[in-house]
Amino acid sequence: VLAEAVKDTLGTVIIENRAGAGGNIGVGAAARSAPDGMTLGIATTASHGINPWLFKQLPYDPVKDFAPVTQMLRVPNVLVINAETAQRLRINTVADLIAYAKANPGRLNYGSGGNGSAGHLAGELFKNQAGIFAVHIPYNGGAPAQAALLGGQVDFNFDNLATAAGNIRSGRLKALAVTTAQRTQVMPDVPTVADTLPGFE
């Protein structure tokens, strides 16, 4: 999408996807490229805000190796539960999830795209603010975590709204809340976690 949008201005754009290690592989490659203005890297909260605290040695310096250009987008996370699990456990709201977790300590688990991922950190913040316990199950990326949720291997996830939206609309996942301070225009009927846990973002 980006390459198409800028081709008339910049000419041919070559997209090179280098996933892995929480963004470190791709961002590291961008950092090692020639500083000639011909390479753009797309950084994330993970690559520049979280990973410096998780990894002893990064293949880049998040401050010195880059010149920021613009913020391209902001995608909220969404607290989702497998629709069949939601029906079986009678969980329709964030308050229901919290009440179930408190009444059944240690019974719930949640998946994420890996230790230190946005979904993991949101899950830990949620547990802390709600005063509940749920076992964290880290996966090797967001796609396997969502597959585990769809397959019923985990009870809930804090997932990227862009990747979860299709399964929410199809009815396979139930969106309980978004993690942003305000509701999202993409799904305006979905409340915020902060509606139940004030200050959560």
Task: List the model feature ranges, each with a label.
Residues 44-45, 83, 161-162, 180:
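Short secondary-structure boundary segments
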Residues 74, 93, 164-201:
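C-terminal lobe and pocket-closing loops
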Residues 1-64, 106-107, 115, 128-160, ...:
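N-terminal (or domain-start) structured segment
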Residues 32-38, 53-144, 191-201:
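Hinge/capping helix and adjacent helix->loop/strand transition within the periplasmic-binding protein
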Residues 24, 73, 80, 158, ...:
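Short aromatic/basic micro-patch
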Residues 23, 47, 86-87, 116-119, ...:
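Alpha-helix N-cap/loop-to-helix initiation residues
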